[in-house]
Swiss-Prot record:
Name of the featured protein: UPF0246 protein FTN_1542
This protein's GO CC annotations: cytosol
Organism: Francisella tularensis subsp. novicida (strain U112)
GO terms for biological process, alphabetical: response to hydroperoxide
InterPro entries: YaaA
Pfam families the record matches: H2O2_YaaD
Domain of life of the organism encoding this protein: Bacteria
UniProt record similarity statement: Belongs to the UPF0246 family.
NCBIfam families tied to this protein: PRK02101.1-3 (NF002542)
Length: 254
C-alpha cells in the first residue's frame, strides 16, 4: 500500500537534528531540465506565469537561481517530510512521528511535485515553487503530462515490491492527474472528507487538507495495509460514512 499526497507551497528550511539516512531525489535529470528552464524566467515573467505578487516573484527568482541540481546535502537542502508545511502537513505533524514510523513512511508515502515528480519522505529537496498546474511546457507537454509516464512507471516499480497493491490517493486533483490511472499496476482508492453544514455535507478545502494529513499519519502510525482498517479512522470527529462511499472512494464525515 502506498499513499500519495500533494506538496505545499510553504516550506520550512530551519535545520533539524536527526540521525536519519537521507536520500537523493529520484528524477535528477528531469529536475535539471526543469530548473534550467525556470532559470530563464525573469521576475516579471515569473509573476505572470505563477500569478503571484512582485515581491513573491522576486523570492521565487532568487530560489531558482540559487538552486544547485547537482548538490543535495544539509547545507542547501532538507528532507521533504520535514520541509513542506502547508495544511496537509499540519495534520501530519511529521516532526512528532517516531523514527520507526518515518522509516516506514519512506516505503509507503510519496509526495507529488511539479519540480521533483515524486518525492520520498527522506529525499533532500531545495527551496522551489512550481505547482503542477503551472502553465509551462516541457518537451512540448504541459507539466502533469510531462511527468505522467515517469511517475506512473516509478510507482509501478514500487508496487512490484508491495504485498498489497493499493494506491491511497490523498492528493488534490491538480497533483493526482500526474498519475496515469489506466497504466497503474494497483487499485486506486480516493479518500474524501466532508463537513455537515446546516444538514448538508460539503467538502471544505482547508478542513479536507488537514484531514488528509491526519489520515496519512493514522495509516503510517498504525502500519495499515488494508482498506477495512482505513475505515476505522476516527480522528478529529471524522467517521466513515458508507452513504457517500463506494468501492473506489472512502468518504469520512463529521
Amino acid at each position: 500500500m502506498i499513499i500519495v499526497i500533494s506538496p505545499a507551497k510553504s516550506q520550512n528550511f530551519e535545520p533539524i537534528k536527526t540521525d536519519y539516512q537521507f536520500t537523493q531525489p529520484i528524477f535528477k535529470q528531469q529536475i535539471i531540465k526543469l530548473i534550467n528552464t525556470l532559470k530563464h524566467y525573469e521576475v516579471e515573467e515569473i509573476e505572470k506565469l505563477m500569478k503571484i505578487s512582485p515581491k513573491l516573484a522576486e523570492e521565487v527568482f532568487a530560489k531558482h537561481n540559487s538552486f544547485n541540481p547537482n548538490k543535495y546535502d544539509n547545507s542547501n537542502a532538507k528532507a521533504a517530510i520535514f520541509t513542506f508545511s502547508g495544511d496537509v502537513y499540519k495534520g501530519l505533524e511529521a516532526d512528532t512521528l517516531d523514527n520507526k514510523t518515518i522509516e516506514y513512511a519512506q516505503n509507503h508515502l510519496l509526495m507529488l511535485s511539479g519540480l521533483y515528480g515524486l518525492v520520498r519522505p527522506l529525499d533532500l529537496i531545495q527551496a522551489y515553487r512550481l505547482e503542477m498546474g503551472t502553465n509551462i511546457k516541457i518537451d512540448g507537454k504541459i507539466l502533469h503530462k510531462y511527468w505522467q509516464d515517469k511517475i506512473t512507471t516509478q510507482l509501478n516499480e514500487y508496487f512490484s515490491q508491495q504485498q498489497n497493491k493499493i494506491l491511497i490517493n490523498l492528493a488534490s486533483n491538480e497533483y493526482s492527474q500526474a498519475i496515469d490511472k489506466k497504466s497503474l499496476a494497483a487499485k486506486w482508492l480516493d479518500i474524501d472528507f466532508k463537513e455537515n453544514k446546516a444538514g448538508a455535507y460539503k467538502t471544505i478545502g482547508i478542513h479536507a487538507k488537514k484531514a488528509r494529513g491526519l489520515m496519512t499519519r493514522y495509516i503510517l502510525e498504525n502500519r495499515i495495509e488494508n482498506v477495512s482498517d482505513i475505515k476505522k479512522f476516527n480522528v478529529a470527529g471524522y467517521q466513515f460514512n458508507p452513504d457517500f462511499s463506494d468501492e473506489n472512494l472512502l468518504c469520512f464525515t463529521r
